[in-house]
């Protein structure tokens, strides 16, 4: 399915279009997340972030410009990865003494 048709269907609330987007772009999104995190995230964290990217797509598909879906997904994936890395860097375990 081409990007424009996929976006049109997403904008009309078509859940099958979301499933198609996940099938078509999940490997790309996970690769972006993995490369951006430089292996600092577990595969489970990478998958969780990828799910979050597609949830954001579902919520914000009206803001995606036609013909730019892949770039938009990559940008969201990079931003979410950086946010996760920042958050994990700021978390300091408390000693239980």
Residue ranges and their predicted role:
Residues 3-6, 17, 49, 69, ...:
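Hydrophobic side chains within well-formed alpha-helices
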Residues 12-20, 30-52, 63:
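Short, charged helix-capping/linker segments at alpha-helix termini
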Residues 54, 58, 77-78:
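Conserved short alpha-helical segment within the catalytic ATP-binding HATPase_c
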Residues 63, 75-95:
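Arg/Lys-rich amphipathic alpha helix in sigma70-family domain 2
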Residues 1-27:
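N-terminal module of bacterial RNA polymerase sigma factors
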Residues 45-48, 61-75:
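Short, aromatic/basic-enriched loop-to-helix "N-cap" motif that marks the start
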Residues 24, 52, 97:
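Short acidic/histidine-centered micro-motifs embedded in hydrophobic/aromatic stretches
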């Amino acid at each position: 399915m081409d990007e424009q048709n996929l976006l049109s269907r997403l904008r009309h609330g078509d859940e099958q279009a979301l499933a198609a987007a996940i099938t078509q772009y999940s490997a790309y999104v996970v690769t972006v997340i993995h490369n951006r995190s430089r292996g600092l995230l577990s595969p489970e964290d990478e998958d969780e972030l990828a799910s979050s990217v597609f949830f954001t797509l579902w919520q914000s598909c009206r803001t995606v410009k036609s013909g730019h879906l892949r770039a938009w997904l990559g940008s969201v994936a990079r931003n979410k990865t950086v946010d996760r890395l920042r958050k994990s860097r700021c978390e300091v375990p408390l000693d239980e003494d």
